[in-house]
Amino acid sequence: MLTFQAFIQSPGETFLNLGFITIRWYGLLISVSVLIGLFISKKLAKARNINPEYISEILPSLIIFSIIGARAYYVIFEWRQYSGENFFTSLELFNNAIKIPSFLAVWEGGIAIHGGLIGGLISIIFFCKSKKIHLKTFIDILIPSIILGQSIGRWGNFFNNEAFGIPTNLPWKLFIPIQNRPLEFINYEFFHPTFLYESLWNLLVFIFLILIFNKQNKTDFFRPGFISCLYLICYSFGRFWIEGLRTDPLCIGGLPPFCDGGIRMAQFISIFLFSSGLIGIFFLRLRTYIGKNRKNG
């Protein structure tokens, strides 16, 4: 009797191998995210009467600071992966293998979005101060592109066979090759596609933020900074629950896959960011309320 079993499977991390250079899906997706984000952010900047060229100007430093932050954050909490005999890895370039420190091999995966957000925020603060741009307005312009980039970038985890969830037999289950499975789940073939959950959630958040952005100038309810706060709330809410399914968490005081005796760092940060978003909205509304009373008084 024939049986049909549906599942998702990565075709591999390589998009194109030209012999002298290899293009990986992860790098390609990041590049696509940057180009789409550049286009969207310029449109949003123009809608807020901010010079769209500022987006092009900040882009190099934003990318560099975000990648450094994302990688540093991950390496700090997963140093055991990059120490000892794993300290070096090979970079194939023009048919030659060059040894480099493994923590520099970002294209192999291993970045943390919370670290990227910290690095990106530092870059934005410095840029806004140098150009004398209103910080909250400028961040509101960039935020939709950031969450869309997160949605696209999550597919890099799919191609790298990483950042997946606990075993499952759901129709949309993800097949993971044995060499990529945690030892605790070595005999399981199918796992939750947490990359897909987060990608879809982030896409919904992007659509929601764009709708709010288009209403921001029509009412004083959505003050500058409101979109940034909504991002913190919505993204953190989804990330908290999805993180609970993952088998590769960064842990404080524990070890993957369940951080026994400790806490999942991403969930801890999500609670902090969620709370920060709520507090931010409270103070934005308070300023609006005080401003109205002063006008009426």
Swiss-Prot record:
One of its GO terms (biological process) is lipoprotein biosynthetic process. Its EC number is 2.5.1.145. This is Phosphatidylglycerol--prolipoprotein diacylglyceryl transferase. Coiled coil: none annotated. Keywords: Cell inner membrane, Cell membrane, Membrane, Transferase, Transmembrane, Transmembrane helix. It is found in: Cell inner membrane. One of its GO terms (molecular function) is phosphatidylglycerol-prolipoprotein diacylglyceryl transferase activity. Pathway: Protein modification; lipoprotein biosynthesis (diacylglyceryl transfer). The chain crosses the membrane at residues 20-40, 57-77, 107-127, 133-153, 193-213, 225-245, 266-286. A 1,2-diacyl-sn-glycero-3-phospho-(1'-sn-glycerol) binds at residue 154. One of its GO terms (cellular component) is plasma membrane. Catalyzes the transfer of the diacylglyceryl group from phosphatidylglycerol to the sulfhydryl group of the N-terminal cysteine of a prolipoprotein, the first step in the formation of mature lipoproteins.
